[in-house]
Swiss-Prot record:
The PsaA/B heterodimer binds the P700 chlorophyll special pair and subsequent electron acceptors. PSI consists of a core antenna complex that captures photons, and an electron transfer chain that converts photonic excitation into a charge separation. The eukaryotic PSI reaction center is composed of at least 11 subunits. It comes from Phalaenopsis aphrodite subsp. formosana (Moth orchid). It comes from the Eukaryota. This is Photosystem I P700 chlorophyll a apoprotein A2. PANTHER family: OUTER MEMBRANE PROTEIN, OMPA-RELATED, PHOTOSYSTEM I P700 CHLOROPHYLL A APOPROTEIN A1-RELATED. The gene is psaB. Keywords: 4Fe-4S, Chlorophyll, Chloroplast, Chromophore, Electron transport, Iron, Iron-sulfur, Magnesium, Membrane, Metal-binding, Oxidoreductase, Photosynthesis, Photosystem I, Plastid, Thylakoid, Transmembrane, Transmembrane helix, Transport. P700 is a chlorophyll a/chlorophyll a' dimer, A0 is one or more chlorophyll a, A1 is one or both phylloquinones and FX is a shared 4Fe-4S iron-sulfur center. Signal peptide: none annotated. It catalyses: reduced [plastocyanin] + hnu + oxidized [2Fe-2S]-[ferredoxin] = oxidized [plastocyanin] + reduced [2Fe-2S]-[ferredoxin].
C-alpha cells in the first residue's frame, strides 16, 4: 500500500473520506497523538522545532532590513524624520494604471511604494543605524543566524546530538541558563551596544567596527567604575536643546536617571534606557545563580515548593506535588509561558505609546495606532491560548493522586465558587454599564443631554495625581510639593517626569472623564466575561456535573446540542471557541477607545471625545461612521488615491468576516446533502466525470466547521479594523 498523508497516523491515512485531509492538518502538530511517539521523541521534536521557529523569525527580520535598504528611503528619512514618509518596500503590480502609479508614488520614490507603519525606521535610527550599508550588514547577519538556527534544528535530530529526557527535565539548569545566559547576558550586551554605538550615534559620532576600540564612550573610560565613583557616569547629560543625531547640545553622560522625554524626539532619554538595561542585566545575572545545579549551591525548586505549606492546616497542602506535576507536563509549562507572554505583550502595547523609547515615533501617529492595536490583538490570542493549554493539561496530564489537597486540587474543589463570582462580576458590569450608556442615549435622543448620568472617575484621577498630574487639584504625593515622595526624587528623575506627565501633547497619563469611566467598565465587562469562559473551560475540562471524568473523551469534542444529552456545558474546546469571540469583542472596545481618544488628542479637539463618548450613538456616529469616510472615498468620481487599497481591504475584510457566519450558523446535515448533490451532478456531467477523486467528500465535523467559522470571523474582523485604523489615521495626519 502506498503511504498516504498523514504519515504520522495510520488510522487516519486509511480513512476513505476527505476527513483524512482535514483531521491530518488539524493533528499535524499534536505530536502527543502521533503513532510511535515516545516521551523522548516528543521533547526532541519540540526542541528541534524551536530552532526552526527562530530561523523563520531571523529570516523575516532580515527581509525587513533588506527591503528597506534596497527599496526604502532610510538615508533621506534620517535627514527629516518628521516630514519624510518612511518607505517599507516598492510595489510591483502590472495592473496599476497611471492614476494608481501616481497615487502610490510617494516618500520621494521613483515608483509606487508602501509606507512603513511598523516603526522600524525609528527603531533602527535610535539604536545607531545610519546608512543603507548598515541595513544590508544587519540583513546579512540575520540571514547567517537563520542558517545557523536551521543547522541547529537538523543537528539536534541526529542520533549523536539528541538530548535525553533527563536533560529536558532539568528545570534548575534551564532556569539558570535562561535567566543569566539569555536575559542577563543579552541585557548586558544591549547596554554595551547602547553605550558604545547608539548613544555616540545620537551625539553625531559614527561608531563602527573600524573605530569601535578607539572611540571612548565616556571621556574617563572605565576609571569611575574601578574607583567607585559611579555617579560620574550620570554627570553632564544631554541638554534640553540637544538635536538628536548631532553634537549640538550633547553631553557626555552614559547612564542617567533624568526622567521624562527628550524635548525634540519626544522619546525616553537614551542614557536612561541604557541605565535601565544595565539594572535589568544585573538583576537577571544574580537571579540566574539562585537555583541548585551540579555545583550543589543555591535552592532546589522542589524543596522550595514542598516547603510552601500554609500555616494552621486549614488551607491544605499548599504547593506539595506541584514540582513534578509542572515538570512532567508540557501543556502546563506552555500555559504558564503563554500567560506570561500574553501579559507582557499587552504591557508592550501600553508602554510603547505612553513611554515611547524610539526617537520621533511619538509624532508618527499612524505607526503609534498600528503598533498599539497589533500588540493588543497578539496579546489576546496568546492569552486565550494559555487557557486552552491549561485545559489540555487537566485532560491529558493531571493526576489527582499526585496533587491531593494541594493548590491545584483545591482550585478544582472551589471551581463553582470561582465561576459564580466571575459570573456575578460580569453580569453586574454588563447590566450597569449598558444601563448607563442606554440611559444617556435616550436623554440625547429626547434633546435633554443635561439629564445624562455622568460619573467622574475620581479614584483613577486620584491615582494619576499621586503620580504627579496636577490638573485635577488633588495635591497628593508627587503632585504635592510638600510630600516626602516629592522631595526624595526632586534632585534626580522627578523634574523630567513631572514635566512629561503635565505636558498635554504626549500620551502619558491622559486626562480622563465620564466617557473614560464608562468605556473602562465596558472593557472590564469584556475582560471578566472572557476570563469567565476561559477559566470555566479549563476548570471543567477534566470533569463537570454532567460528565465526571472526561479523560478518555479528549479536548476537542463538540458542544452538540440537547440531542446527545447536552454537551454544551462541558466541552473545553467549545469554551475556548466562545472565549475567542469575547476576546475579539473586548479588544475591539479597547482599540476603539485608544484610537478615538488619541485622534481627538492629536487633532486638538479632545472635547469631541469627552462629549460624544458618553452614549452609544456617539461612538457609532462620531467615531466609527465619521472616521470611515476615508474608506468610502478610496475610490470616488475623481479617480482613486493612496487610500484605495485600504478601502478595498475594508470591503474584503467585511466579506471574509461575513463568510464566517456561513460556517457558524449552519446545520451539518445541510452541508452533507449539498456536497452529495454536487458530487452527483459532477459524476453525471460529461467531461467533468473524467475527473475522479480518491476520497469521498463529507461535510466538516461540528468542531471543524466552528473552527473554520471562527478563523474567518477573526481574520475578517482584524482585516476590517486594520484598514479602518490605518486609513482614518494616515488620511488625517499623513
Amino acid at each position: 500500500m502506498t503511504l498516504r498523508f498523514p504519515r504520522f497516523s495510520q488510522g487516519l491515512a486509511q480513512d476513505p473520506t476527505t476527513r483524512r485531509i482535514w483531521f491530518g492538518i488539524a493533528t499535524a502538530h499534536d505530536f502527543e497523538s502521533h503513532d510511535d511517539i515516545t516521551e523522548e521523541r516528543l521533547y526532541q521534536n519540540i526542541f528541534a522545532s524551536h530552532f526552526g521557529q527562530l530561523a523563520i523569525i531571523f529570516l523575516w527580520t532580515s527581509g525587513n532590513l533588506f527591503h528597506v535598504a534596497w527599496q526604502g528611503n532610510f538615508e533621506s528619512w534620517i535627514q527629516d524624520p518628521l516630514h519624510v514618509r518612511p518607505i517599507a518596500h516598492a510595489i510591483w503590480d502590472p495592473h496599476f494604471g497611471q492614476p494608481a502609479v501616481e497615487a502610490f508614488t510617494r516618500g520621494g520614490a521613483i515608483g509606487p511604494v508602501n509606507i512603513a507603519y511598523s516603526g522600524v525606521y525609528q527603531w533602527w535610527y535610535t539604536i545607531g543605524l545610519r546608512t543603507n550599508g548598515d541595513l544590508y550588514t544587519g540583513a546579512l547577519f540575520l540571514l547567517l543566524l537563520s542558517a545557523i538556527s536551521l543547522i541547529a534544528s537538523w543537528l539536534h535530530l541526529q542520533p549523536k546530538w539528541k538530548p535525553s529526557v533527563s536533560w529536558f527535565k532539568n528545570a534548575e539548569s534551564r532556569l539558570n541558563h535562561h535567566l543569566s545566559g539569555l536575559f542577563g547576558v543579552s541585557s548586558l550586551a544591549w547596554t554595551g551596544h547602547l553605550v558604545h554605538v547608539a548613544i555616540p550615534g545620537s551625539r553625531g559620532e559614527y561608531v563602527r567596527w573600524n573605530n569601535f576600540l578607539e572611540v571612548l564612550p565616556y571621556p574617563q573610560g572605565l576609571g569611575p567604575l574601578f574607583m567607585g565613583q559611579w555617579n560620574l557616569y550620570a554627570q553632564n547629560p544631554d541638554s534640553s536643546n540637544h538635536l538628536f543625531g548631532t553634537s549640538q547640545g550633547a553631553g557626555t553622560a552614559i547612564l542617567t536617571l533624568l526622567g521624562g522625554f527628550h524635548p525634540q524626539t519626544q522619546s525616553l532619554w537614551l542614557t536612561d534606557i541604557a541605565h535601565h538595561h544595565l539594572a535589568i542585566a544585573f538583576l537577571f545575572l544574580v537571579a540566574g545563580h539562585m537555583y541548585r545545579t551540579n555545583f550543589g549551591i543555591g535552592h532546589s525548586i522542589k524543596d522550595l515548593l514542598e516547603a510552601h505549606i500554609p500555616p494552621g492546616g486549614r488551607l491544605g497542602r499548599g504547593h506539595k506535588g506541584l514540582y513534578d506535576t509542572i515538570n512532567n507536563s508540557l501543556h502546563f509549562q506552555l500555559g504558564l509561558a503563554l500567560a506570561s507572554l500574553g501579559v507582557i505583550t499587552s504591557l508592550v502595547a501600553q508602554h510603547m505609546y505612553s513611554l515611547p523609547a524610539y526617537a520621533f515615533i511619538a509624532q508618527d501617529f499612524t505607526t503609534q495606532a498600528a503598533l498599539y492595536t497589533h500588540h493588543q490583538y497578539i496579546a489576546g490570542f496568546i492569552m486565550t491560548g494559555a487557557f486552552a493549554h491549561g485545559a489540555i493539561f487537566f485532560i491529558r496530564d493531571y493526576n489527582p493522586e499526585q496533587n491531593e489537597d494541594n493548590v491545584l486540587a483545591r482550585m478544582l474543589d472551589h471551581k463553582e465558587a470561582i465561576t459564580s463570582h466571575l459570573s456575578w462580576a460580569s453580569l453586574f458590569l454588563g447590566f450597569h454599564t449598558l444601563g448607563l450608556y442606554v440611559h444617556n442615549d435616550v436623554m440625547l435622543a429626547f434633546g435633554t443631554p443635561e439629564k445624562q448620568i455622568l460619573i467622574e472617575p475620581i479614584f483613577a484621577q486620584w491615582i494619576q495625581s499621586a503620580h504627579g498630574k496636577t490638573s485635577y487639584g488633588f495635591d497628593v504625593l508627587l503632585s504635592s510639593t510638600n510630600s516626602p515622595a516629592f522631595n526624595a526624587g526632586r534632585s534626580i528623575w522627578l523634574p523630567g517626569w513631572l514635566n512629561a506627565i503635565n505636558e498635554n501633547s504626549n500620551s502619558l497619563f491622559l486626562t480622563i472623564g465620564p466617557g473614560d469611566f464608562l468605556v473602562h467598565h465596558a472593557i472590564a465587562l469584556g475582560l471578566h466575561t472572557t476570563t469567565l469562559i476561559l477559566v470555566k473551560g479549563a476548570l471543567d475540562a477534566r470533569g463537570s456535573k454532567l460528565m465526571p471524568d472526561k479523560k478518555d473523551f479528549g479536548y476537542s469534542f463538540p458542544c452538540d446540542g440537547p440531542g446527545r444529552g447536552g454537551t454544551c456545558d462541558i466541552s473545553a474546546w467549545d469554551a475556548f471557541y466562545l472565549a475567542v469571540f469575547w476576546m475579539l469583542n473586548t479588544i475591539g472596545w479597547v482599540t476603539f477607545y485608544w484610537h478615538w481618544k488619541h485622534i481627538t488628542l492629536w487633532q486638538g479637539n479632545v472635547s469631541q471625545f469627552n462629549e460624544s463618548s458618553t452614549y452609544l450613538m456617539g461612538w457609532l456616529r462620531d467615531y466609527l461612521w465619521l472616521n470611515s469616510s476615508q474608506l468610502i472615498n478610496g475610490y470616488n468620481p475623481f479617480g482613486m488615491n493612496s487610500l484605495s487599497v485600504w478601502a478595498w481591504m475594508f470591503l474584503f475584510g467585511h466579506l471574509v468576516w461575513a463568510t464566517g457566519f456561513m460556517f457558524l450558523i449552519s446545520w451539518r446535515g445541510y452541508w452533507q446533502e449539498l456536497i452529495e448533490t454536487l458530487a452527483w451532478a459532477h459524476e453525471r456531467t460529461p467531461l467533468a466525470n473524467l475527473i475522479r477523486w480518491k476520497d469521498k467528500p463529507v461535510a466538516l465535523s461540528i468542531v471543524q466547521a466552528r473552527l473554520v467559522g471562527l478563523v474567518h470571523f477573526s481574520v475578517g474582523y482584524i482585516f476590517t479594523y486594520a484598514a479602518f485604523l490605518i486609513a482614518s489615521t494616515s488620511g488625517k495626519f499623513g
